[in-house]
């Protein structure tokens, strides 16, 4: 199954606000109380929220769940930490891109340096003390500057620092899962995959 490239607003109406997918918000969420929702459907919707927000394929999400299961600690929290520390998500949280798909495009088009080295993989896992900045070209600088102008006034994540002289971001620590701006029950996602295998 490939990455979703269809109408984004349909997904937002179905699953609720997904800030990583688009910066629009749904007008009115349909009343789903009359419909009977099975446990499977609830788990599936939570999994789909996570998948569409971060722009992952099904296979990528399965791999992240496997890695999270092997790690110490709560599988759900480790899963969210792994997803939040992806390079495309860090660029989105820093405000260098308006959405996660826009951040993926920045990375794929080779506009981003991590610790002074060119990185062209959106799934690159950032670590604490990583420095993320646009490439030293005018085109890269303009793209990031335009996104940062739209970002002004929004709250920056506690695990990140943004410096404006040369535009660069610093990852201070691993993200705290309480800060994530997505209403999701990560345990239902883990349950969904534990029942699949």
Curated annotation (Swiss-Prot):
Q: Entry's PROSITE patterns?
A: RIBOSOMAL_S4 (PS00632), S4 (PS50889)
Which Pfam families does the UniProt entry name for this protein?
Ribosomal_S4, S4
- State the Gene Ontology BP annotations: ribosomal small subunit biogenesis; translation
Cellular component, GO annotation: plastid; small ribosomal subunit
UniProt KW keywords: Plastid, Ribonucleoprotein, Ribosomal protein, RNA-binding, rRNA-binding
Q: Where does it reside?
A: Plastid
From the UniProt annotation, give the residues forming the signal peptide: none
Answer yes or no on keyword Cytoplasm: no
Named from the GO MF annotations, one term is: structural constituent of ribosome
Q: Where is the S4 RNA-binding domain?
A: 85-157
**Main localization of the protein described in the UniProt heading:** plastid
Assembly behavior: Part of the 30S ribosomal subunit. Contacts protein S5. The interaction surface between S4 and S5 is involved in control of translational fidelity.
For this protein, the record's PANTHER family field holds: 30S 40S RIBOSOMAL PROTEIN, SMALL RIBOSOMAL SUBUNIT PROTEIN US4M
Family affiliation: Belongs to the universal ribosomal protein uS4 family.
Function of this protein?
One of the primary rRNA binding proteins, it binds directly to 16S rRNA where it nucleates assembly of the body of the 30S subunit.
Tell me the protein's name. Small ribosomal subunit protein uS4c
State the organism of origin: Cuscuta gronovii
